[in-house]
């Protein structure tokens, strides 16, 4: 699947499912590299990895490249269109060939997963600015609870997105975005 197809899918989902999508385009390669950088300095051995909100897979792609044969990656995506797209990407794009059997796409809400500590690293691409504070708290509590001792959690927030959203948000949304 070429980049422009993924971008079209992403933009369509942004328009139709803004609350859970939150970005106009998929994350770029530089962000994906930064998000998975922890794999380069963590003690190596079999690792269990979790990606929350992988979308069309830019972070998944870099994580797959950094995985060793004993690693596994669960990519948890709530959006069925993104989950289906990511499965196709993993099954058909050559960059995933080496790690294809080690990656599982799970279509569900992260809060529905068991909270036992089992992951060495978690990469999170959720649009936290779209969520209410209690939702953000529940998401972070769940992810931190899923990390093994010494595990790493990588997440990001788009720079200036709060100020860009303010003119379009209702009163309640403006209060939330102002912090």
Model-inferred region functions:
Residues 46-55:
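Conserved class I S-adenosyl-L-methionine
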Residues 83-115:
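S-adenosyl-L-methionine
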Residues 5-42:
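Class I SAM-dependent methyltransferase Rossmann-like catalytic core
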Residues 56-69:
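Conserved SAM-binding loop of SAM-dependent methyltransferases across substrates and taxa
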Residues 137-149:
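A short glycine-rich, Lys/Arg-flanked "PGG" loop and its adjoining helix->strand segment in the class I
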